[in-house]
UniProtKB/Swiss-Prot annotation:
Gene3D superfamilies: HprK N-terminal domain-like, P-loop containing nucleotide triphosphate hydrolases. It comes from Delftia acidovorans (strain DSM 14801 / SPH-1). This is HPr kinase/phosphorylase. One of its GO terms (biological process) is regulation of carbohydrate metabolic process. The Walker A ATP-binding motif also binds Pi and PPi. The lineage of its organism: Bacteria, Pseudomonadati, Pseudomonadota, Betaproteobacteria, Burkholderiales.
Amino acid sequence: MRPSAISADVLFEEFRSSLRWEWVAGLGASERRFDEMAVRSARSGADLVGYLNYIHPYRLQVLGEREIAYLSNATPQDCQRRVARIVTLEPPVLVLADGQTAPEALLSMCERAHIPMFSTREQSAFVIDVLRAYLAKHFADRTTMHGVFMDILGMGVLITGESGLGKSELGLELVTRGNGLVADDAVDLYRINQTTIEGKCPELLQNLLEVRGIGLLDIRAIFGETAVRRKMRLKLIVHLVRKETMEREYERLPAEPLTQDVLGVPVRKVVIQVVAGRNIAVLVEAAVRNAILQLRGIDTYQEFVQRHRRAMERGDTF
C-alpha cells in the first residue's frame, strides 16, 4: 500500500525552514500533486525528482545554474520554445536552486500553466538529495504488524507471537538489559528500497509499553532517553510459540534458515518456544548474536554439518 500523492503546499511547508525556499510563482496551484500513474510506476519515490529533463515527465524538476543557462542563453524564439516545453512535462513543482533568478518567460509560464515554483539558495545537488530521501520514504510501500519492535544489540528485531505469550513483558525485560524500545503492539513498517524494511512507532503510541496487570508504561520517562529508539531497520523476526505449536509446525534443527516475507523482502526469522522456566530474554539475545554471526558469514549449523561429514568420512564413532 502506498499513500496518496503529496500536494505542493504540504511539500513547501515540510521544507520551508530546512531548504529556506520561497514560493515565487504558481501560488494558485497549491493543491497540485504528483501524477498518480507516475507514482505507481516509479520504482521508488526517488525517481520522482531530478534535474530538468525533457524525457522524464511528471516528476519534480530542479533547475540549477546549468538549467537556467540552457533556458536563457539562446535566441528569444529558442528560449521561449524551451520554456514552453516544460509545460508538456506536467511537473508537480519546479524548484529553482543555486540562488538563480528565474527568467521572466519561466515565471509567466508557471502562472499561466498553474505550476508552483519554489526558489532556494541551496545547492541543486543538495536539494535533490533531500527531496529524494523524503519522497522515497513518503511513497514507500508500507504495512502495520502486531508485535514489539526493538533495538537488540544494535539490530532491529520484531518480536511476534500469539496474544498472551508475554511479548510486552519480554520487551520490558530486554529494556532492563540495556536494549531499546521502538514500538509496542503496532509497528509501522516501510520498504525504503528493494532490500530494506524500516520500522517505527505510530505517533500515538510513542515510548509506550503495555504490560498486563500494570498498564501503560512510559519507557522514556522511566528508563531514560537511551531506552527508546525513533526507528530501526528490520533485520530479524523472533516468533514466540507455545509448546504444542512448536512440536506440530517446526523442526527442531531446520536445515535451511527460516525467513518471513515482509513487503516483498525476505526477513530472517527464528522461532522460540515459550514454556515456564525458560529465560526468553537470554534466548532472544542469543538468537540475535547468532544472526549477527550469520550476516558475517559464520553459520554454526552448516559448520556442524561439515564437521559431522568429515567425521563420517574418517569412520569416527560417536
